[in-house]
């Protein structure tokens, strides 16, 4: 499956890392399987985002970052997708942002509406962390730029041409200061 992706796309979001903490050997293998210029986005393990809910995650986060680091220039952002019932906890978000080494770009997908406020946006901006703009069955999250790159997850089954035009307009509007956009 990976061979199929690297032939057709320039970026892939790895969801397997959400279900199982990857080893350095596994991640290095992914890097070796991709051509120059290919980018991987790794989704943070549920152990960090769902089970621990960003609390006391020093050790698993360090392990995850060490594994991710083996991708070198093929590494894109690390995506932290929080559970829908996880309400705003800026203290925990701040701790995780401080723990992730500055060499990593990070994006956060918040799925509880309490996260969508200026305090959270300011905290993300302070670390150049992207607010993931997600389009789901429940609706779209606020389109707010908080980093010098964008991260959008379009997860509907189908998009009409008009839907895609609206997303292109959103990306154009938000992306004036972006170096990259991951869609």
Question: Which residues fall in each region the model found?
Answer:
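Residues lining hydrophobic/aromatic ligand-binding pockets adjacent to catalytic sites
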Residues: 1-182
């Amino acid at each position: 499956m990976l061979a199929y992706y690297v032939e057709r796309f320039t970026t892939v979001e790895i969801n397997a890392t959400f279900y199982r903490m990857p080893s350095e050997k596994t991640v290095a293998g992914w890097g070796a399987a991709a051509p120059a210029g290919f980018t991987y986005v790794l989704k943070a393990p549920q152990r960090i985002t769902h089970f621990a809910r960003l609390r006391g995650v020093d050790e698993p986060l360090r392990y995850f970052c060490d594994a991710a680091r083996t991708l070198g220039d093929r590494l894109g952002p690390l995506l932290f997708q929080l559970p829908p019932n996880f309400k705003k906890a800026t203290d925990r978000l701040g701790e995780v942002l401080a723990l992730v080494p500055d060499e990593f770009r990070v994006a956060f997908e918040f799925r509880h509406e309490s996260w969508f406020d200026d305090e959270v946006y300011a905290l993300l901006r302070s670390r150049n962390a992207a607010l993931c703009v997600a389009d789901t069955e429940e609706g779209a999250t606020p389109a707010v730029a908080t980093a010098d790159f964008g991260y959008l997850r379009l997860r509907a089954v189908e998009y009409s041409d008009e839907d895609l035009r609206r997303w292109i307009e959103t990306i154009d509007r938000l992306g004036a200061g972006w170096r990259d956009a991951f869609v």
